UniProtKB/Swiss-Prot annotation:
Native organism taxonomy: Eukaryota, Viridiplantae, Streptophyta, Embryophyta, Tracheophyta
Gene from which the chain derives: matK
Protein name per UniProt: Maturase K
Gene Ontology process terms (BP): mRNA processing; RNA splicing; tRNA processing
Protein family according to the UniProt entry: Belongs to the intron maturase 2 family. MatK subfamily.
Gene Ontology molecular function: RNA binding
UniProt keyword annotations, A-Z: Chloroplast, mRNA processing, Plastid, RNA-binding, tRNA processing
Amino acid sequence: MEKFQGYLEFDGARQQSFLYPLFFRDYIYVLAYDHGLNRLNRNRPIFLENADYDKKYSSLIVKRLILRMYEQNRLIIPTKDLNKNLGHTNNFYYQMISVLFAVIVEIPFSLRLGSSIEGKNVKKSYNLQSLHSIFPFLEDKLSHFNYVLDVLIPYPIHLEILVQTLRYRVKDASSLHFFRFCLYEYCNWKNFDSKKKSILNPRFLLFLYNSHVCEYESIFFFLRKQSSHLRSTSYDVFFERILFYGKIQHFFKVFVNNFSALLGLLKDPFLHYVRYHGKYILATKDTPLLMNKWKYYFVNLWQCYFSVWFQSQKVNINQLSKDNLEFLGYLSSLRLNPLVVRSQLLENSFLIDNVRIKLDSNIPISSIIGSLAKDKFCNVLGHPISKATWTDSSDSDILNRFVRICRNISHYYSGSSNKKNLYRIKYILRLCCVKTLARKHKSTVRAFLKRLGSGLLEEFLTGEDQVLSLIFPRSDYASKRLYRVRVWYLDILYLNDLVNHE
């Protein structure tokens, strides 16, 4: 991003906060292309959606695109030309525009973020970026709460809602009109042939989604701060998680007047909000009546302000002492551990019954077995079967694939309270690996293991234990507790990498 700023120093568009002229600069396309190549996700460039984009990209195509953008009528795809090469050419241009728009529109956000934290002693903690970093927080906080709202974030069904949401953050009217034009043209092409693959860049779609969610969170956090007796934590501390740019004066004029009666009913200083994977949870120590009021508030917020039809069935009220909470691949619930404490006062001794509340995070074994059965690792009952599609690979390749999957699952579910389900998953993968190798060599499992020996599966038994042995001291007592301890790793950034075994 510093390279972008260096070029924009000589461009008058930046001084006037105009982004639209940047679409007609050749160097912006080059920088965006280079910026995408340097940011890899799962060994693939984020800038590229498929391999053909790299082959088609050239300076000549960029110049043609800029000439077409000077005359937007040439970017419109007539219905009669949707099946011709002209439609495919324009679709490729829209793909380039979506990539460029995502890169350009991030420039004012990065500049604003840099100026907001300039001079402040804000420390970056990369451990907070891990998926496992939230579980210690939940173990500390949820044990004191009673209810959790599990809400599925609705998506806008109309494109104009996305444009209006982006209007609060992008002040350039020309860029918004151009964005609306390209978005509607893409949807017309998509509606004509629904089987076509999306041409919009994933980074561009992620930016639209984050803008939509940020608009909702800015309203919610403002109302939450107004309705609470305690002062909320400044959002600058969490700049790595949420880029929150609130419109406080606008909210104060509109929402305080409309929700003045409701704010008095939602006063609760003990409230925690966590967003993940298109959902969010709201943990509180309220009564069932107040939880239903929160549910009513969220339904009306989405329907009235965002004009999105939001069904109340998408808001689940879970009682932690009775219900399980599905969170980031875990099933979490509260467990009561009775404790008996012996107390002695002078010569009199007596027993005190005490109950300790603990948050248990277990493995959803049924859903994982269903996923393994879908990928042909086992049947629906959990019995291992051979992976027929992998028999054409070499023995080392087959073994490495199974070992990678087994280690990734063990790595992610290392914080489970019940290790038996994890051992069952490992057993399925180990036996599936043996059956796959035996099928390749046209032999039985017993004869194959007898011929190669037990050293074949040593790769499954090592790896995770070596990591744990570096964390805990090497003693007999520690080795006995090695398979029962719960470990949360702070290096898991992407959940899709854990299941990427191809």
